[in-house]
């Protein structure tokens, strides 16, 4: 038989028949103990106790239990009849994330004990990272701060296991371990390489718990904008509006308007959801407008919206605007954008505040806000309020702020759940595929009824808005009391408790005298709003009625996000002059430590960022669970008796009682804000005894998501509620006329001006004196301070404008060729309200000839907000860097400017700007280097030498120096980042910037010459090189010359991967290298090993010398084996053991061969030496000695004769002979083989014969060095420097003796230099004046010195000899309009290889710009779309194009250049193509601008 529920009238009758003693007052003692439902470990927490009607002394014990272990939180003895207090406790180290909290109250006749489950969470300290700016250029230094505070914002002396930098490819490129934060703050810095991976980087801070705090910054190649383009328009417009006002304004960073042409494009884009043509330009609706900016730098346009069809679907529901402003004078064009949403929702309603619960008989409070589509309040409109659909309906009117306060009388409400809907306008539901209809949103809210057996209630009146820190807020309580429940009580005490940041913050009470018959009314009391209550405070108010019933209500307050440490930051004035002195004053809590920052507004225009703000700091706070969660498996032991739900049979029908579960009770109120309540008062609604379950039903706590969580029975797992985020910080008296003229000379232009720490004194004051930068801009400055007492405080961002009433700007080319002329423009800008008379002058110099352009006037009138440009036609006469100094001076003159009197500025009367121009000689630069190693032993040595110049040398271009060093690696040490005058744009070339630093550090360390300065510089180069090399890494751990290039097919290169693997393994001793990079590279290489132990080639060999005259596999395997042994891996390692088997097998074949195989044998000799195989090492060296070239007491090795002769012929077209790269490399490998033995310190166990041979090899190698200490190319430089460093360590001796070097020419002493232990690493240089000339160098004393003579000169290109490349260069105007054709043209290049080999190695095409022109970067970048072009670079006035290889098939490509500065008498510019590894193989061709033969002879 189906069971039926008992009818409601019968159920109510049963409730009335409940025993009277269930509701009667007993007068027994009452206990209330309150604890947060989640506790933090390591920070103070509170437990609050309320004891009432005690008739005996009791002991209170609050205990935290972990199984059989426990800790006491509170032990107290209560004597007073009534007491209410809170007590603090701290949980040091929790044994488990969950525990039981037990409350026991025991007296002679009373015993109360209850246990509840509890979460315990370690309080994670909020941590944030602040960088000095949001965006960086390659090569700049990233500065950042790590800050740690507790949940009260007091500094935490925390230690982080690791802080690291992660690049856009998620590679860890640098790290700091065990970073301490004394005082809660630590500053770190990190240098970016000159060629880093561009994109988003991260600073990652890892805590002990493993949690990571990440902060992002961008690395980008950029130029700071001079001005910004602002597009001002409504964010939203109604679809019925007919006009849209759009304003575009240009403002300089110093706040002044930009004069220029404004172009505005207004579009609504096409966006059918089923179309692939979203945003398709041809289907977009667009209009364009153009006009000169007004005096405010703005252009205002009223746009008619009808053309954009705002009511039609199928288009984006927004109008987008792109505005461009082209600055007058310079032609610089910048863009700004804006958009306006087209809204069909014409009104929106939302609840700003409302009661969470409702209590029958007490008014329900709520507030709603009505706004239009733009978010503007709609005043004086009637709103309809419906309760539970249309059962009850009310009308309220909005005030002038669009707010309507809702007050609903609930006296007659009987429903357990109240749903409230607020309506402004009803919607007409109409679905149309083509047209948009208007819509009005409604506001909805729900409130559950609170159960009270006596129908007694209290309700807090809503507090609207955000409460300010420091204010006193009145709390109003509405009450409705049952007289029977009050009995004869004369007063009633209201207890309140404030919960903030998950913990109990404060508590108190207020007594209400009871008047006879007054059971309904309002009582109020004040509370003070304090910073510790922010951002949200939860107030719970409760009282205990004489019938033992507890009634309560709760309300949340939004608190101003304030800090106890108030920080004020100020400059003495809002504006300063460039280069003046000022100071930044900071005020905060005494003895605070303050971190100050000031960033150029231009940086923030380029990369806006979120400021470090109260909101961002408060977002870092961990969040506790707000709802009490049942953890299980604690059996349910409610303090209240349950009602047995027995069936009732009536007229033969069985009725089941209906239990109402929808009402909330006082227990739910406490639970809703995360409080555990232990009490013997009545806080629960009646419950039926459980029939089938061992555990209680989880209470509904008023939040749908909490109810959903509680539906999981026995849930013992809970994800972390602690949220950690990271933040970036923005980063920001008159002089009388007779006094000396004040002049500014501007040359200091930083992007971050201030990045300093300032400790405050006992009065809370601090001052930072600073020099104002020369940038005419606005600086954004801010500060945060840390105090051990009041914690963290933030200042507001302040602005400081650097400005002067008038200033001068110079427009110059980067470089010109001697004989060319250019127009130097000096523009004076006047931003004063009055006119000034200005004299503009250019300081004359013998280095150039300057002639004024146009009518020459001694002075010029410039009125307010106007500018004047004065020009000179300049012809440089000297070579090198020529400085141009221009001055604008305000004159005291009776002469009127029109009808206005010219005034003299009080602060600055003169502005001077100095800018350089590089003046280059005509033709192509050549360099010859002569190196000599002289070792006098207490006797004078003399060397005669001659500097000759070729017949076709360019007059005045020759310059020469002789350098003297006391150390074999001295020159290389001076030029570690400039060993080669070649580009470094690929994965192998970058290693020449990386690896030599390791050898220098090892050499200096072994010879005890390592200083902190050298170590710091070398390590910084290693860090930079490590960053760059990761650009060439593939996802599988391998490396290739140009890296993983996205869609273009590329694979790892076996040879380069081995090179990188060895270098990274060796660099670990000096810098952080991520282990996975070494592991992954080694694993990848291991996969390339064949069964015979040899390695197979993957990727192309850009250097043909690696082929070595034998099977490529043997040479490559020898190279990889050397790399593995140098890591070092032991010879017993399986990969190494198998590789050595490959080499031994190969040597057996080579030793019986009649061919030379010099390159391969050199590698084999060194590999066997590293492996400790002395026998094989001796065999190979003996074979190599037969191939050795002995000359002039030196020894070296060279390639087979036929190749050598071909190369020598090629040299006849080039420089004075220097050994090819491959010969230096193979000779260096032989030197390494001689210097390496099996001992732990191999260089100390060498025989005298080995050292003698090594010395002869060193003499030859040292003669091949270039003027920077490198050699011809990358591999020869790396291997030769490694060999020289080993030789230097083997032969190093300290001596107190000195060597003197005297240089004479024609009987005249050019210079005398002295070398000793104190300066042996110092590069000493003498400039040689006689060119051509005969010189004598005399060396005396005891020791060795390295002499290097460098001769540089320019020659005019001649068709001499047969070049191994064909090169043709043509130019063509891009615009045939005669007035414009000289401003832009195309350079087309055809190139091929016609040398002796089937194809070239990697080739560089170097295109120098003609003066006054710059490359169009997108057209250069587009060249990389061609399969054979691997990379392009734009270097000042050069374009570099990397080509993988060339054959005899002609390859053609082109790119565009455009005019930057007008230059007359344009000279041709050279294009050079050369083999990167055989630098003697090259060709040169000149090109001219297509209009250079015009009558004007230039582009001026």
Curated annotation (Swiss-Prot):
It is found in: Secreted. Its main location: secreted. Disulfide bonds join 48-86, 249-298, 267-286, 469-562, 594-785, 642-689, 835-863, 861-897, 935-1344, 1094-1142. SMART domains: A2M (SM01360), A2M_N_2 (SM01359), A2M_recep (SM01361), Thiol-ester_cl (SM01419). There is a cross-link at residues 986-989 (Isoglutamyl cysteine thioester (Cys-Gln)). PROSITE patterns: ALPHA_2_MACROGLOBULIN. CDD domains: A2M_2 (cd02897). Residues 1360-1500 are annotated as: Receptor-binding domain. One of its GO terms (molecular function) is protease binding. Glycans are attached at residues 55, 61, 157, 382, 412, 568, 883, 944, 1005, 1390, 1448. Widely expressed. Highest level in ovary, testis, uterus and prostate. Protein found in plasma. Coiled coil: none annotated. Gene3D superfamilies: 1.50.10.20, 2.20.130.20, 2.60.120.1540, 2.60.40.1930, 2.60.40.1940, 6.20.50.160, Alpha-macroglobulin, receptor-binding domain, Immunoglobulins. Keywords: Bait region, Disulfide bond, Glycoprotein, Protease inhibitor, Secreted, Serine protease inhibitor, Signal, Thioester bond. Residues 686-746 are annotated as: Bait region. The keyword Secreted applies. Residues 1-24 form the signal peptide. GO terms for cellular component: extracellular space. Is able to inhibit all four classes of proteinases by a unique 'trapping' mechanism. This protein has a peptide stretch, called the 'bait region' which contains specific cleavage sites for different proteinases. When a proteinase cleaves the bait region, a conformational change is induced in the protein which traps the proteinase. The entrapped enzyme remains active against low molecular weight substrates (activity against high molecular weight substrates is greatly reduced). Homotetramer; disulfide-linked. Belongs to the protease inhibitor I39 (alpha-2-macroglobulin) family. This is Alpha-1-macroglobulin. It comes from Rattus norvegicus (Rat).
């Amino acid at each position: 038989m189906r069971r039926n529920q008992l009818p409601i009238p019968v159920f109510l009758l049963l409730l009335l028949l409940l025993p009277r003693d269930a509701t009667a007052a007993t007068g027994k003692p009452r206990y209330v103990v309150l604890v947060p439902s989640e506790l933090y470990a390591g920070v103070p927490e509170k437990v609050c106790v309320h004891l009432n009607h005690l008739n005996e002394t009791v002991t209170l014990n609050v205990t935290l239990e972990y199984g059989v272990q426990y800790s006491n939180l509170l032990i107290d003895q209560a004597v007073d009849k009534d007491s209410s207090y809170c007590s603090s406790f701290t949980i040091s180290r929790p044994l488990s994330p969950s525990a039981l909290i037990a409350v026991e109250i025991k007296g002679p006749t009373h015993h109360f004990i209850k246990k509840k489950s509890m979460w315990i969470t370690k309080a994670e300290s909020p941590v944030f990272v602040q960088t000095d700016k949001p965006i960086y250029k390659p090569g700049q230094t990233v500065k950042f701060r790590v800050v740690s505070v507790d949940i009260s914002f007091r500094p935490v002396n925390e230690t982080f296991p690791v802080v690291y930098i992660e690049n856009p490819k998620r590679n860890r490129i640098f790290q700091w371990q065990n970073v301490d934060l004394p005082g809660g703050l630590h500053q770190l810095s990190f240098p970016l390489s000159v060629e880093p991976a561009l994109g988003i980087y991260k600073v990652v801070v890892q805590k002990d718990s493993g949690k990571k705090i990440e902060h992002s910054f961008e690395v980008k190649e950029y130029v700071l904008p001079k001005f910004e383009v602002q597009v001002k328009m409504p964010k939203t417009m109604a679809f019925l509006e007919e006009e849209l006002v759009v304003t575009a304004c240009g403002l300089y960073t110093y706040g002044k308007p930009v004069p220029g042409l404004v172009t505005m494009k207004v579009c609504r884009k096409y966006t059918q959801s089923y179309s692939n043509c979203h945003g398709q330009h041809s289907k977009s609706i667009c209009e364009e407008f153009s006009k000169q900016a007004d005096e405010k730098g703005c252009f205002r346009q009223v746009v008619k919206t009808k053309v954009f069809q705002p009511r039609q679907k199928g288009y984006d529901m927004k109008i987008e605007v792109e505005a461009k402003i082209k600055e007058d004078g310079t032609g610089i064009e910048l863009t700004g954008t804006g958009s306006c949403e087209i809204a069909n929702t014409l009104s929106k309603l939302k609840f700003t505040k409302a009661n969470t619960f409702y209590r029958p008989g007490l008014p329900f409070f709520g507030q709603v806000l009505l706004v239009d589509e733009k978010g503007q309040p709609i005043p004086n409109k009637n709103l309809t309020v419906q309760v539970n659909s249309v059962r009850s309906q009310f009308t309220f009117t909005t005030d002038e702020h669009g707010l309507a306060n809702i007050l609903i009388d609930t006296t007659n409400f009987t429903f357990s759940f109240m749903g409230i809907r607020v309506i402004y306008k009803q919607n007409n539901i109409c679905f149309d595929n083509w047209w948009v209809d208007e819509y009005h949103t409604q506001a909805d809210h729900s409130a559950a009824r609170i159960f009270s057996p006596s129908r007694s209630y209290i309700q807090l009146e809503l507090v609207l808005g955000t409460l300010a820190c420091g204010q006193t807020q009145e709390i109003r309580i509405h009450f409705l009391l049952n007289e029977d429940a009050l009995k004869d009580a004369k007063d009633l005490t209201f207890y309140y408790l404030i919960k903030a940041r998950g913990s109990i913050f404060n508590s108190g009470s207020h007594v209400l005298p009871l008047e006879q018959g007054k059971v309904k009314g309002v009582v109020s009391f004040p509370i003070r709003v304090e910073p510790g209550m922010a951002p949200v405070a939860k107030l719970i108010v409760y009282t205990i009625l004489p019938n033992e019933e507890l009634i309560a209500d709760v309300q949340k307050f939004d608190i101003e996000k304030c800090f106890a440490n108030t920080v004020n930051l100020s400059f003495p004035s809002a504006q300063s002059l460039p280069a003046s002195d000022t100071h930044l004053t900071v005020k905060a809590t005494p003895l605070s430590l303050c971190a100050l920052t000031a960033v150029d507004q231009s940086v923030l225009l380029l990369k806006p960022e979120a400021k470090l703000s109260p909101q961002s700091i408060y977002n870092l706070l961990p969040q506790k669970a707000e709802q009490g969660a049942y953890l299980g498996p604690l059996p349910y032991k409610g303090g209240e008796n349950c009602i047995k739900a027995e069936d009732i049979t009536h007229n033969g029908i069985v009725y089941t009682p209906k239990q109402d579960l929808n009402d909330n009770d006082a227990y739910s109120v406490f639970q809703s804000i995360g409080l555990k309540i232990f009490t013997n008062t009545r806080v629960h609604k009646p419950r039926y005894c459980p029939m089938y379950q061992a555990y209680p039903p989880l209470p509904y706590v008023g939040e749908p998501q909490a109810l959903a969580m509680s539906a999981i029975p026995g849930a013992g797992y809970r994800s972390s509620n602690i949220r950690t985020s990271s933040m970036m910080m923005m980063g920001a008296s008159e002089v009388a006329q007779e006094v000396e003229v004040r002049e500014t000379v501007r040359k200091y232009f930083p992007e971050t001006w201030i990045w300093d720490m300032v400790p405050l004194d006992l009065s809370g004051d601090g001052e930072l004196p600073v020099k104002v930068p020369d940038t005419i801009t606005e600086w954004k400055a801010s500060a945060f301070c840390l105090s051990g007492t009041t914690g963290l405080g933030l200042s507001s961002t302040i602005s400081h404008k650097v400005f002067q009433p008038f200033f001068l700007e110079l427009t110059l080319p980067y470089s010109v060729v001697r004989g060319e002329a250019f127009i130097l423009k000096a523009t004076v800008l006047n931003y004063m309200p009055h006119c000034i008379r200005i004299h503009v002058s250019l300081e004359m110099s013998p280095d150039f000839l300057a002639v004024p352009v146009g009518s020459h006037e001694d002075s010029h009138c410039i009125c307010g907000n106007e500018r004047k440009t004065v020009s000179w036609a300049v012809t440089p006469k000297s070579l090198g860097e020529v400085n141009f100094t221009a001055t604008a001076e305000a004159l005291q003159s009776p002469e009127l400017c029109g009808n206005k009197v010219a005034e003299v500025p009080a602060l600055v009367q003169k502005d001077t700007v100095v800018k350089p121009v590089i003046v280059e000689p005509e033709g192509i630069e050549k360099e010859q280097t002569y190196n000599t190693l002289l070792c006098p032993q207490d006797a004078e040595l003399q060397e005669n030498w001659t500097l000759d110049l070729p017949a076709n040398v360019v007059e005045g271009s020759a310059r020469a120096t002789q350098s003297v060093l006391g150390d074999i690696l001295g020159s290389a040490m001076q030029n570690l980042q400039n060993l080669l005058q070649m580009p470094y744009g690929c994965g192998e070339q970058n290693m020449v910037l990386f690896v030599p630093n390791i050898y220098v550090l090892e050499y200096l360390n072994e010879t005890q010459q390592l200083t902190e300065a050298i170590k710091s510089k070398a390590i910084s180069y290693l860090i930079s090189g490590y960053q760059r090399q990761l650009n060439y890494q593939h996802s599988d751990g391998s490396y290739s010359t140009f890296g993983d290039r996205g869609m273009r097919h590329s694979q790892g290169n076996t040879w380069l991967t081995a090179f990188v693997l060895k270098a990274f393994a060796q660099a670990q001793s000096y810098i952080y290298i991520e282990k996975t990079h070494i592991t992954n590279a080694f694993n990848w290489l291991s996969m390339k090993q064949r069964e015979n132990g040899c390695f197979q080639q993957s990727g192309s060999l850009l250097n043909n010398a690696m082929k070595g005259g034998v099977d490529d596999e043997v040479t490559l395997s020898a190279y990889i084996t050397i790399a593995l042994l140098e890591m070092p891996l032991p010879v017993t390692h399986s990969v190494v053991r198998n590789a050595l088997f490959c080499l031994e097998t190969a040597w057996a074949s080579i030793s019986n061969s009649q061919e030379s195989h010099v390159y391969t044998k050199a590698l084999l000799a060194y590999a066997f030496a590293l492996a400790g195989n002395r026998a094989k090492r001796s065999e190979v060296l003996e074979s190599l000695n037969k191939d050795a070239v002995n000359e002039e007491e030196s020894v070296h090795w060279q390639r087979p004769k036929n190749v050598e002769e071909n190369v020598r012929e090629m040299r006849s077209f080039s420089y004075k002979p220097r050994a090819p790269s491959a010969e230096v490399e193979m000779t260096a490998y032989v030197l390494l083989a001689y210097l390496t033995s099996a001992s732990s310190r191999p260089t100390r166990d060498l025989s005298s014969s080995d050292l003698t041979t090594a010395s002869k090899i060193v003499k030859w190698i040292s003669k091949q060095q270039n003027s920077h200490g490198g050699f011809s190319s990358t591999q020869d430089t790396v291997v030769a420097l490694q060999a020289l460093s080993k030789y230097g360590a083997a032969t190093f001796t300290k001596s107190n003796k000195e060597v003197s070097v005297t240089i004479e020419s024609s009987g005249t002493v050019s210079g005398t230099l002295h070398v000793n232990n104190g300066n042996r690493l110092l590069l000493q240089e003498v400039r040689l004046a006689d060119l051509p000339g005969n010189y004598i160098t005399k060396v005396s004393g005891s020791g060795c010195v390295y002499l290097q003579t460098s001769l540089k000169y320019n020659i005019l290109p001649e068709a001499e000899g047969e070049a191994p490349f064909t090169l043709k260069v043509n130019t063509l105007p891009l615009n045939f309009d005669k007035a414009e054709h000289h401003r832009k043209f195309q350079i087309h290049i055809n190139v091929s290889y016609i040398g002796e080999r089937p194809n070239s190695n990697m080739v560089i095409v170097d295109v120098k710009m003609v003066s006054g022109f710059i490359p169009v970067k997108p057209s250069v970048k587009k060249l990389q779309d061609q399969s054979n072009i691997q990379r392009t670079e734009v270097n000042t006035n050069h374009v570099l194009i990397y080509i993988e290889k060339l054959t005899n098939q002609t390859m053609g490509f082109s790119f565009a250049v455009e005019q930057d500065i007008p230059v007359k008498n344009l000279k041709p510019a050279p294009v050079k193509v050369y083999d990167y590894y055989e630098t003697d193989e090259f060709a040169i061709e000149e090109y001219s601008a297509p209009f250079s033969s015009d009558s004007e002879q230039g582009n001026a």
